[in-house]
Swiss-Prot record:
NCBIfam families per the UniProt record, alphabetical: ilvD (TIGR00110), PRK12448.1 (NF009103)
Residues noted as binding [2Fe-2S] cluster in the record, renumbered to the chain: C122, C198
A cellular component term, taken from the record's GO annotations: cytosol
Pathway it works in: Amino-acid biosynthesis; L-isoleucine biosynthesis; L-isoleucine from 2-oxobutanoate: step 3/4; Amino-acid biosynthesis; L-valine biosynthesis; L-valine from pyruvate: step 3/4
Catalytic activity: (2R)-2,3-dihydroxy-3-methylbutanoate = 3-methyl-2-oxobutanoate + H2O; (2R,3R)-2,3-dihydroxy-3-methylpentanoate = (S)-3-methyl-2-oxopentanoate + H2O
Protein name, entry field: Dihydroxy-acid dehydratase
Gene Ontology BP annotations: isoleucine biosynthetic process; L-valine biosynthetic process
Origin species: Neisseria meningitidis serogroup B (strain ATCC BAA-335 / MC58)
Database matches in HAMAP family: IlvD (MF_00012)
Record Pfam families: ILV_EDD_C (PF24877), ILVD_EDD_N (PF00920)
Residues with N6-carboxylysine modification: K124
Binding site for Mg(2+): D81, D123, K124, E494
Length: 619
């Protein structure tokens, strides 16, 4: 039977000093002996997805105390990728994932906490907390802040029809010379109307949905709107449940509640299957690989490639389809509706554990909104947007009269009526990316699934943006942006601005983009990222010359630099001859801080999740 970790600092004569300090935090004499639950919040006023989390930690903490445990809240950092986008701030986004994981490990282990509640929401916070959960392997529950409501705009002088929109619309239209200043202003003012993570299936919402598929959060975690009063119950339930599973582990020796017992290889395959089926962000591949690595699970790019070939796309939302947003996914039954359709098609391992049900099979049955007996599920998924600008959580209680149960033409479809039988994400291999690169196929027009073009090579995102806005790119070009990987950036910037600007120039379906960097979850189009190995690690993307021909074949999962093996070898030898200047960008003027240099020194390429190679410390 495992002992409560907290006994280390709360029991014994030699811990009198520690107990004195615990008392100073409000712990009473009768509390000693109760489990100590760490509540890792990520509130910040910098990020709309986190601006409403200020009171969430204490909401959970009070429920933990009612259930018979001690709750202690602390905070982690949270970077807004949208605000950091397009300038040097984006270099810090991915490295922050490791800082978040480390900070949680430090706090939990330093204070000997017994269990953990992770209050996350946006892009790097959820994966950072997942990495920490796998590293610590103590009872853990995730509860996120929830998605933002979709924006709405009537149109200038009421001439245009009403349309829904999001952050990406603001970025694209601001760079389109055909859009007036007044129209841009209207889009800007309406794109992000409420608190919460951006309203489409971008990285934040994708990751929060994946915590449901992994079995580490409650149903609705990824889709229940941040503004809806009903979401409060998720926080309260998380507070009660963490105490229950903590006691099951420490007092009943039930290891099935531990993160590593829940997030097995089967669970990672389920999460990736669901991600492919809903056309999630390509960043999810990066993060799932990193989380699996921390969990000691043998889950690699080859597994993702295998799944991508057999899983259809049955849910298609913004940015891939502007008919649907997260609020529509919720109305259709949320993530468990997607899981149900995948299960019916035999695409899931349903014998895995979850924190809230003995098996995933049980959970799917309990949260099936098509079963009229599941009244709790039906009521939860009727939650609707309020349509009022706000930064306050739980500020409205509007409900849909009916759910979207149309599995033929609705938001979530059955496999027979899938948006496409080919999944929403794919891994490509070839001489330009020997260890793979990734593309969100859900966002690629069918006309360019096979594409051959002329390479236009840029050694930084900044140069690429200048080239695109300077009209240097024409139809048929393939924009190559290299030395932007985890090591080469360092920090693996997102390339949302280059892809958005290609669209604003009318080239969204006429060009491709390949990079060893990554993309925002808001990216769509023929945008291929995570080229591995990256240029700074000796990857062949660093050997592409201006004007080379690159051949992309998504159906056959290939990407090829059209030169001979002999020519490629000769270019590699020429690069190596540069000595200390080899595999480094030419003429790039970029300030790199000591913190970023430290990250880059240990960073691995994207095919390994861009995790730190800690083995270097031992060498």
């Amino acid at each position: 039977m495992p002992e409560y970790r907290s006994k280390t600092s709360t029991h014994g004569r030699n811990m009198a000093g520690a107990r004195a300090l615990w008392r100073a935090t409000g712990v009473m004499e009768t509390d000693f002996g109760k489990p100590i639950i760490a509540v890792a919040n990520s509130f910040t006023q910098f990020v709309p997805g986190h601006v409403h989390l200020h009171n969430m930690g204490q909401l959970v903490a009070r429920e933990i105390e009612k259930a018979g445990a001690i709750a202690k809240e602390f905070n982690t950092i949270a970077i807004d990728d949208g605000i950091a986008m397009g300038h040097s701030g984006m270099l810090y986004s991915l490295p922050s994932r490791d800082l978040i994981a480390d900070s949680i490990e430090y706090m939990v282990n330093a204070h000997c906490a017994d269990a953990l509640v992770c209050i996350s929401n946006c892009d790097k916070i959820t994966p950072g907390m997942l990495i920490a959960a796998m590293r610590l392997n103590i009872p853990t529950i995730f509860v996120s802040g929830g998605p933002m409501e979709a924006g709405k705009v009537i149109g200038v002088a009421n001439i245009q029809p009403e349309r829904r929109l999001d952050l990406i619309d603001a970025m694209i239209e601001s760079a389109d010379d055909n859009v007036s200043n007044r129209q841009v202003e209207e889009v800007e003012q309406n794109a992000c109307p409420t608190c919460g993570s951006c309203s489409g299936m971008f990285t934040a919402n994708s990751m929060n949905c994946l915590t449901e598929a992994l079995g580490l959060s409650l149903p609705g975690n990824g889709s229940y709107l941040a503004t809806h009063a009903g979401r409060k119950e998720l926080f309260l339930e998380a507070g009660r449940m963490i105490v229950e599973i903590t006691k099951r582990y420490y007092e009943q020796n039930d290891e099935t509640v531990l993160p590593r017992s829940i997030a097995t290889k089967k669970a990672f395959e389920n999460a990736m299957t669901m991600d492919i089926a809903m056309g999630g962000s390509t960043n999810t591949i990066l993060h799932l690989l990193a989380v699996a690595n921390e969990a000691g699970v043998d889950f690699k790019m080859a597994d993702i490639d295998r799944l991508s070939r057999v899983v259809p796309c049955i849910c298609k939302t913004a940015p891939n389809n502007h008919d649907y947003y997260m609020e529509d996914v919720h109305r259709a039954g949320g993530i468990f509706a997607i899981l149900k359709e995948l299960d019916k098609a035999g695409k899931l391992h349903t014998d895995v554990h979850t924190i809230h049900a003995p098996t995933l099979k049980d959970a799917i049955e309990q949260w099936d909104v098509t079963n009229p007996e599941n009244t709790r599920a039906i009521e939860r998924f009727k939650a609707a947007p309020g349509g009022v600008r706000t930064t306050q959580a739980f500020s409205q209680n509007r409900m849909w009269k009916t759910l979207d149960l149309d599995r033929e033409k609705g938001c979530i479809r059955d496999v027979a009526h899938a948006y496409s039988q080919d999944g929403g994400l794919a891994v490509l291999f070839g001489n330009i990316a020997e260890r793979g690169c990734v593309v969100k196929t859900a966002g690629v027009d069918e006309s360019i699934l096979k594409f051959t073009g002329r390479a236009r090579v840029f050694e930084s995102q900044e140069d690429a943006v200048e080239g695109i806005l300077g009209n240097q790119i024409v139809a048929g070009d393939i924009v190559i942006i290299r030395y932007e990987g985890p090591k080469g950036g360092p920090g693996m910037q997102e390339m949302l601005y280059p892809t958005s600007y290609l669209k604003s120039k009318g080239l969204g379906k006429a060009c491709a983009l390949l990079t060893d960097g990554r993309f925002s979850g808001g990216t769509s189009g023929l945008s291929i990222g995570h080229a591995s190995p990256e240029a700074a690690e000796g990857g062949a993307i660093g050997l592409v010359h201006e004007g080379d021909t690159v051949e992309i074949d998504i159906p056959n999962r290939s990407i090829h630099l059209a030169i001979s093996d002999e020519e490629l070898a000769a270019r590699r030898a020429e690069m190596e001859a540069r000595g200390s200047k080899a595999w480094k960008p030419k003429n790039r003027d970029r300030y790199v801080s000591a913190a970023l240099r430290a990250y880059g020194a240990m960073a691995t390429s994207a095919d390994k999740g861009a995790v730190r190679d800690v083995a270097q410390i031992e060498r």
